[in-house]
Amino acid sequence: MVSRAKVGAETTKGIDEPDRNDNTDDNGAGAVEVTEAAEDAVELTNDISTQLPQHGFLARFYTGLSRLYTGTGVFEVVGRRRLWYSVGGVIVAVAVLSIIVRGFTFGIDFKGGTTVSMPVSPGVGGTGAIEVAQVADVFKKTLGSDPESVVVVGNGASATVRISSKTLSNDQTSKLRNALFDAFGPKGADAKPSKQAISDAAVSETWGGQITKKVVIALVVFLVLVGLYITVRYERYMAISALTTMCFDLTVTAGVYSLVGFEVTPATVIGLLTILGFSLYDTVIVFDKVEENTHGFQHTTRRTFAEQANLAINQTFMRSINTSLISVLPVLALMVVAVWLLGVGTLKDLALVQLVGIIVGTYSSIFFATPLLVTLRERTELVRTHTRRVVKRRTLGSQVGKKNADSHVAAGTRKPQNQAESCADASSQEGTEVATASVPTVLSKLAPGVRPVRPTGTRRPTGKRNNVGRR
């Protein structure tokens, strides 16, 4: 019995020791590399699993949307920045071309002129739909030229017709007022027809120029302060990227006004400052996350600077979208109130420029600001050196991982042969009878009638000592 246990223990020891030696030799050379490579492999597996088709487009869309909401999305922005640069370049080119070719439709505040207003006549329906065409016809018959614009301002009993034209002399203004009174008979506050219900005002073009000059000064001061703040708070590359993004927003918004033909008023110019503030806020949100992710990035080789920046975009993607949607709601409400309820042109102009600016600012903060920051930072020696280290470490880790996988496969194919050879050696040393009893000890399946070998060590598996000599 003792010889059988002894042979079983020696046989087990002979079989187990080569495996331990192989593992020690394989892992001792690159333990750190294998550990980091394993972490990257797990992360890469998670990323790839999210990109595999999962029961149709809707399932993949829902999975991607849920990952964006949790900040773990894999939406590639920085890696495709050349595509976004191309899209942005086309948009800017169209905007600049429209500004050069079409120009702007300036309001009366910028080019000067005369405005004539009168209440909407109830006899024509009170809606102003027919009133506009009739007023334009009366204007042309009276003065021999078409008005620049005829619009209905307000709604209901407070609705008025506003006529805008080039600067008129006093005689022309008086003649037009008489013609409008004869054609429509507007009523005054006492509900009786009165010429006093028709009002006129001359607007000097210098007033619009003064407003524009003040807005330009405010814009320059705003950009300087923003550049100084971002440089002190973050870094100069973020300041350059943020200022370039705001110039992009201004150019595209101005191009939209020129292309569509929206009227440019002082409210429009003032609204540009509002959209710059919104664009800056949205950009700083992403930059703050980029700074958090890239803090001390040069001390690790897990991700490159570009990958950390792309992760920051994914983590703030839905926050930017939700912020934009929440900002659009009051702007749309302002447009509804301005157009359909009050008819106040100033509110409409202000809401319109804000709506266009919010859409453009959201796009630029996600697809332009951060990719431009990465492009600027990748020109520095620090980021280039760190990127080379990450690529080198990943290459080394993949090679070590492949070597370990090959060694484990080879060990798995040789193990049954080693067990048989060990059993043969044991049988030659102790005899056929002892060898026959020792083989079942190594293998997991015992032969019928053979008792299992009791462990001969001085410690139990639980760590307690055996009472040596006690039966």
Swiss-Prot record:
Q: What kind of membrane protein is this, topologically?
A: Multi-pass membrane protein
Q: Tell me which Pfam families the record gives.
A: Sec_GG (PF07549), SecD_SecF_C (PF02355)
Instruction: List GO molecular-function terms, semicolon-separated.
Output: protein-transporting ATPase activity
Q: Where in the cell is it found?
A: Cell membrane
Segments of skewed composition (Polar residues)? 415-431
Q: Which residues cross the membrane?
A: 88-108, 211-231, 242-262, 267-287, 325-345, 355-375
- Bias type Basic and acidic residues, positions: 13-23
What does the record give as the function of this protein?
A: Part of the Sec protein translocase complex. Interacts with the SecYEG preprotein conducting channel. SecDF uses the proton motive force (PMF) to complete protein translocation after the ATP-dependent function of SecA.
HAMAP family, from UniProt?
SecF_B (MF_01464_B)
Which named protein is this?
Protein translocase subunit SecF
Its gene name is secF
